[in-house]
Amino acid sequence: MTRIIVVTSGKGGVGKTTSSAALATGFAKKGKKTVVIDFDIGLRNLDLIMGCERRVVYDFINVINGEAILNQALIKDKRTEGLFILPASQTRNKNALTKSGIDRVFTQLVNMNFDIIICDSPAGIESGAVLAIYFSDEAIVITNPEVSSVRDSDRILGIIASTSQRSSQNFKPIKEHLLLTRYNPKRVSNGDMLSTEDVLDILRIPLIGVIPEDTSVLKASNQGTPVILNYNSNAGQAYYDTVNRLLGINCPFRFVKDEKKSFLRRLFRR
């Protein structure tokens, strides 16, 4: 059974595309045939983070418009077996995405035996975001531990509940997951950032992962490499933990405590 997962947020700049690339790579590393689709029409970025921008010949809109077949537009990742990228178009016409066109593409992907379809959604409520949500079975809501980001995520949860295909057909609701990015335990301890508990108290959806603030994320993006492939980075390890949880594997949350304060507490207990 193919899982269609939208990666979304209420605002831009929270690490949506970085997370889409990392999670898709992680699923493929786990043996799942995976495709990650860029729904951000006109602002194509996924191909840059995946390092395949020079290999784009046809795109999502070309397939929807019948100007190319799906196999011509799918880009096979050179580093990870079983991983494919479907890039967005650079067109400024946001209306180029249609329900019927997306439905045809998704039907073909299911028939091609893809296990996972990751939809990299644009931020907010533009048409690409709403359509990505409409077709999905699960939603990963990305937020930073900041009040404005969390507030915008609360709004997107309302959209998920009301606009999905599942809600319109009275099916079981979209399964919602929270992914907290750019988390800095030291800043949380200093009162400069919301804690995981604060965010969960506001959004009230299950926490699937906590990605720490890590310079390796920017470095990986600039190199066109999903950060999950940097096995020595904290962010890469946290994304692997997130993939495991999405596959039903229990693992503890790491990188959520201020290690300096934890060390001092242990020291004074002796």
From Swiss-Prot:
* Gene Ontology terms: biological process: division septum assembly; negative regulation of cell division
Gene Ontology, cellular component aspect = cytoplasmic side of plasma membrane; cytosol
Chief place where the protein resides: membrane
| Classification via SUPFAM superfamilies | P-loop containing nucleoside triphosphate hydrolases
Where along the chain is ATP bound? K11, G12, G13, V14, G15, K16, T17, T18
Q: Subcellular localization, per the record?
A: Cell membrane
Per the record, a Pfam family?
A: CbiA
Known function: ATPase required for the correct placement of the division site. Cell division inhibitors MinC and MinD act in concert to form an inhibitor capable of blocking formation of the polar Z ring septums. Rapidly oscillates between the poles of the cell to destabilize FtsZ filaments that have formed before they mature into polar Z rings.
Q: Which NCBIfam families match?
A: minD_bact
Describe the family membership recorded for this protein in Swiss-Prot or TrEMBL: Belongs to the ParA family. MinD subfamily.
Q: Which protein is depicted? A: Septum site-determining protein MinD
Origin species, per record, is: Buchnera aphidicola subsp. Baizongia pistaciae (strain Bp)
